[in-house]
Regions:
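Basic- and hydrophobic-enriched, low-structure N-terminal and domain-boundary segments
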Residues: 1-162, 166-171, 213, 426, ...
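P-loop NTPase motor domains
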Residues: 24, 150-444, 451-464, 476, ...
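Short alpha-helical interface patches
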Residues: 79-125, 227-237, 281-292, 362, ...
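A short glycine-/small-residue-rich loop at the edge of a beta-strand within enzyme catalytic domains
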Residues: 119-122, 385, 515, 572
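Conserved small-residue-rich
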Residues: 139, 472-474
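Conserved ATP-driven motor cores of ASCE-family P-loop NTPases powering translocation/secretion/packaging/pilus
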Residues: 418, 528-530, 534-628
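Local beta-strand/beta-hairpin segments that build beta-sheet-rich folds
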Residues: 468-470
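Short, surface-exposed polybasic-aromatic patches that bind anionic ligands, especially phosphate groups
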Residues: 643
Length: 783
């Protein structure tokens, strides 16, 4: 029974019971009067009975003859009357006529909303820094998602020029309350807010796909930690390098390309050193996979995988390569050409330089306050698939860290509860060691000094050993930050925080502007549904709903449903989005006057009808400064957009000035992040050589150059083809101990090749070290 019905029944009982008791008492007194004055008629007896109640209220006993039958009869009459009234009420029962056609309305109780959903909770204001901003009046707490019972995902839709960056992304960036990964079309956001973040102690990084030389390096291989990661990487790559118009229901060609790519990437990951793991070497290996349907001779790539199979017959790379080779030669040749065309971007010098090394450090985005800007070319760029690969790996690494090892991390917090440094640990044993390191860091930080760094232009606090503690834009801000660490700093295990430590130390927020240009992220709809518990949130920012429907044709509604807040900034002539928003707003019941005219005159009538709160045509003419916010399980709000200059930190942003990315600054912060880690062994400095030794060295270089040319062209110095197989690298005197016969392996291990190349730096560059036929762990053990 509902609460409303319960209250109605209680009220009816409170009214009915006193009336019933009065009627029974009146009946008893009336029967006494009839016994004393039998000549009175029925109505006169009732009147005298009522007067007798006033004169003798307690004269009930003894009962007059026939009183029992009279009471029973009165009770039956009252019961029958009540039954008739109840049945009639049921027959007349109906819905509220003012809401029967729809009860939608606009959210107006802002004070109540702020108390429930914004920081500080319980107060009628929304001026806390731990809020997300949607409009001038609607905010949402990021610090207490469990209390507000909302996830922090948002779906933002607005046509070109509607203010997606200016009225939504910008104000939320100025909150500076978490780590941000921001899609930045044309780079305007980095220029406007980069220095603001830097002066507040953020690590500012940039993946620039428009001008690649003006950003950090991103090597996808760095974030591969298992063969499963290889499959995910290849799936993302193939999905986002296949033009939509060429996709068909026959997956044979794409699956075959995946087999070859998985085999090569798995080979590099499992059997070569870190320096060799990049897409430049993927392309080099592909060029070694020469296939001729009229010539059954094996290619260099075939020999490489034969060697790998001899060492690791059940290897993942071997299995995929053998499955690829089951096709006919002509088919394999077509597949190889398709793969080369698909990956042609990696032959460009800019892309090669971008992906050969990595300093973007995605693993640290959830460990320290970071602002990563992903700059995309205006419109659809040929390199945007790199962004989808990066986002896919970012999700995977964050999930893996939060689920498996984040609970072991030790955190150094300042007096305000803000994270200063995260010491990551993989196991319980390591957690104890990291705690000691964190305590040592905090102790050293208490003796830190403030200095101005000419490279970065920032004021930084450094320990006596030169370890970076924190940095800010001004000396005053740096002193304040250091003071908060020295006076109130403490060490905290991540597991002592919420969710048993299964969360990132710093909330990670992805503002995916121009979402349609990023490319398709594998299983993105599943990630959006589960990111909340890991301290991750996503804002999907689109120009129209059609973009989401085209990208995720089967799952777009699931994506939209997992965003607890929808923000509509206006869409012009976009009818698809307007109809969808109109349906979300719902209908309200309105009284409509109908007027009709005929020959005999006219008539009017009033009817209640369900009318859209805002029809699609009304949404099309929504004023430029207004927006609509649709929170989960609440009425929608229509009001003013948030104007960026109204933010209390806008003056700070303007004062900070424009940001220009600097290679020197990026290198400094990368070195500072890894300062204190065990250094890799450096190559010994060669002793000074005599002129005779230099001559021998020059001769060895000449011989090595000839051997390399033989290996490349598969022929000897006289131009005669090598019928069996190319001679092994490193056959020159002094390069290896002993001579290798023609029946030996095609080439030596990567360590042998590397040793040779290190001794001949004039001839070989470090990036030329490509091939290997031994597991990577064997190299580290022999080094």
């Amino acid at each position: 029974m509902s609460e409303k019905k319960r209250k109605n029944y209680l009220l009816a009982a409170l009214v009915f019971i006193p009336i019933y008791l009065f009627v029974i008492i009146l009946t008893i007194h009336t029967m006494h009067i009839r016994m004393e004055m039998p000549y009175l008629d029925f109505f006169s007896a009732i009147r005298e009975g009522a007067l007798d109640i006033v004169r003798h209220p307690l004269r009930i006993l003894p009962l007059a003859p026939g009183t029992g039958n009279a009471v029973l009869g009165v009770t039956l009459v009252i019961a029958a009357s009540q039954a008739v009234l109840t049945i009639d009420a049921k027959l007349r029962e109906h819905d509220d006529p003012d809401t029967v056609q729809g009860d939608a309305r606009w959210l107006t109780e802002l004070d109540d909303y702020n108390r429930r959903f914004t920081e500080p909770l319980g107060e009628a204001s929304n001026d806390g820094q731990g809020n997300m901003i949607f409009s001038q009046d609607i905010y949402l707490s990021m610090e207490h998602p469990r209390e507000v019972r909302r996830n922090l995902n948002a779906l933002v839709i607005g046509g070109s020029g509607a203010g997606k960056s200016f009225n939504y992304v910008g104000p939320n960036l100025m909150q500076a309350n978490c780590s941000f990964v921001v899609t930045d079309p044309s780079g305007g956001l980095l220029k406007s807010y980069g220095k603001f973040f830097e002066r507040r102690g953020y690590k500012v990084k940039c993946l620039n796909l428009s001008h690649m030389e003006r950003g950090n390096h991103y090597n996808p291989f760095r974030y591969i930690h298992s063969n499963k990661d290889v499959v995910t990487l290849v799936t993302t790559l193939v999905s986002n390098t296949t033009p939509p118009e060429t996709k068909s229901s026959e997956p044979f060609w794409e699956n075959s390309e995946k087999l070859l790519l998985i085999a090569i990437i798995s080979y590099l990951f499992n059997y070569t050193e870190k320096e060799c793991q990049n897409f430049s070497n993927v392309m080099r290996l592909l060029r070694e996979a020469k296939i001729n349907e009229f010539d059954a001779e094996k290619s260099t790539l075939d020999y490489i995988f034969e060697e790998v199979k001899a060492l690791d017959p059940e290897g993942f790379a071997v299995k995929n390569y053998e499955e690829f080779k089951t096709g006919a030669a002509k088919t394999l040749q077509s597949i190889l050409i398709s793969v080369m065309v698909r990956l042609k971007a990696f032959d460009l010098e800019d892309v090669e330089n971008l992906t050969d090394t990595d300093d973007i450090d995605l693993d640290m985005v959830g460990n320290e306050k970071t602002a990563l800007f992903v700059i995309l070319p205006t419109g659809e760029g040929p390199f945007n698939f790199l962004a989808s690969m990066m986002y896919s790996q970012l999700f995977h690494r964050a999930y893996d860290y939060a689920e498996n090892t984040a609970e072991f991390s030790q955190l150094v917090m300042d007096g305000g509860g803000q994270l200063v440094r995260c010491f990551r640990a993989e196991t319980e044993e390591e957690s104890g060691e990291r705690k000691k390191e964190a305590e040592t860091f905090l102790e050293n930080a208490r003796r830190a000094v403030i200095r101005h760094n000419e490279t970065t232009g920032l004021y930084e606090a450094v320990t006596e050993d030169g370890e970076l503690v924190c940095f800010r834009g001004t000396k005053k801000a740096a002193r304040k930050a250091l003071g908060s660490i020295t006076d109130g700093g403490y060490v905290l295990a991540n597991r002592e925080r919420s969710n048993d430590g299964l969360r990132l130390p710093v909330h990670l927020r992805l503002l995916l502007d121009e979402f349609a240009n990023i490319g398709k992220i594998p299983e993105f709809e599943k990630k959006v549904a589960t990111v909340r518990k890991y301290e991750i949130s996503v804002a999907i920012i689109l120009q129209s709903l059609s973009q989401l429907q085209n990208m995720y044709e089967k799952n777009w509604s699931e994506l939209a449903g997992n965003c607890d807040t929808t923000l509509y900034l206006g869409g012009g002539a976009d009818t698809v989005t307007a109809k969808w928003i109109s349906e979300l707003l719902g209908k309200e019941t309105r009284i409509v006057m109908n007027v009709s005219y005929g020959r005999g005159g006219g008539s009017t009538s009033l009817n209640r009808q369900g009318v859209e709160l805002l029809a699609p045509a009304q949404l099309r003419v929504l004023p430029d400064d207004e927006c609509i916010v649709i929170p989960k399980s609440l009425y929608a709000y229509k009001g003013k957009k948030y104007m960026t200059p109204d933010h209390p930190r806008w003056e700070e942003v303007k004062k900070s000035g424009p940001y220009y990315w600097s290679r020197e600054k990026a290198r400094y912060f990368d070195e500072a992040a890894h300062r204190g880690e065990p250094a890799e062994e450096e190559d010994p400095v060669p002793e000074e050589q005599t002129p005779g030794e230099e001559a021998v060295r020059a001769e060895q270089n000449r011989e090595m150059r000839q051997k390399a040319q033989e290996y490349e062209n598969n022929m000897d110095a006289e131009g005669n083809p090598l019928i069996d197989r190319p001679r092994p690298l490193g056959d020159a005197e002094g390069a290896h101990s002993g001579n290798l016969s023609a029946d030996d392996h095609v080439h030596g291990t990567i360590r042998e090749a590397a040793d040779t190349f290190e001794k001949n730096e004039i001839l070989w560059r470090e990036m030329d070290v490509v091939y290997s036929s031994a597991p990577a762990e064997s190299f580290s053990s022999s080094a």
